A protein has these predicted regions:
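Bacterial N-terminal signal peptides that target proteins for export
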Residues: 2-11
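C-terminal/domain-edge helix-coil "capping" segments
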Residues: 24-43, 95-97, 150-203
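Surface-exposed short loop/turn segments
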Residues: 25-29, 101-151, 161-164, 168, ...
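Generic short beta-strand segments
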Residues: 52-58, 118-124, 157-158
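A structural "domain/chain start" motif
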Residues: 23-84, 194-203
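Mid-chain, structured segments of secreted extracytoplasmic proteins
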Residues: 76-105
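Second-shell loop/turn segments in exported
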Residues: 67-77, 127-128, 168-176
Length: 203
């Protein structure tokens, strides 16, 4: 999707940030469904095998693409952005006793916990003036690698809001918003890895 680039002044960008922040724009996700209690096996787990984000349910035409090739071009940087997020997030959270490894979609592992994220729909809501992000409805699953026992399953609405409020107001391309959403999804997974669940409220 070829987004129209809008040029804003620094003042305008910061003004949008201020207005959006006052309206609660710091939310990066909302939980739709999850278990009532935390998974102790996830909390005590030390090895997490994370599969790339699954976009198989997404139709490029529904997002305004004229061809699958355009979608592939825009989404190509997403796997790397997703993988690169975990070392940063683990360090920020001071988590040094857990290892996160990115595995291929069909890779079979016998140790640790396998993490799957499938994006079921993308709701295009991005508005530069209001700093409103797109939304990614995700099915998140954690399973024991050895037994395939499901340890955690949730439906979480993760958005493409940037941690840099000025970048949010500046006018990101859809490819950049996809990468930002991937980072936010990794952030949600990091919280589950640490807590065995995710905070239920909009965060």
């Amino acid at each position: 999707m070829k987004s129209k680039k809008k040029i804003f002044s620094v003042f305008a960008g910061l003004l949008v940030w201020g207005i959006a922040s006052s309206c609660g724009a710091a939310a990066y996700y909302a939980t739709i469904e999850q278990p009532s209690s935390a998974s102790e096996l996830i909390k005590s787990g030390t090895e997490f095998n994370v599969k790339p984000i699954d976009f198989a349910a997404i139709s490029p035409k529904d997002l305004g693409y004229n061809s699958a090739e355009e979608w592939k071009t825009d989404s190509k940087p997403v796997p790397q952005a997703f993988a690169d997020a975990f070392p940063v997030l683990l360090k920020e959270a001071n988590i040094d006793n857990k290892k996160v490894k990115i595995i291929s979609p069909d890779e079979r592992v016998s140790k640790g916990i396998v993490v799957d994220v499938a994006v079921k729909s993308i709701i295009l809501k991005w508005n530069a003036f209001a700093a409103q992000p797109d939304e990614f409805l995700c099915n998140v699953t954690f399973a024991d690698a050895a037994t395939s026992q499901k340890l955690f399953s949730a439906i979480i609405n993760v958005n493409s809001r940037s941690g840099n409020p000025y970048a949010q107001a500046w006018g990101m391309s859809f490819s950049n918003r996809l990468q930002q959403a991937a980072y936010n999804i990794a952030w949600v997974l990091t919280k589950i890895i640490a807590q065995g669940k995710i905070d239920p409220a909009v965060y």
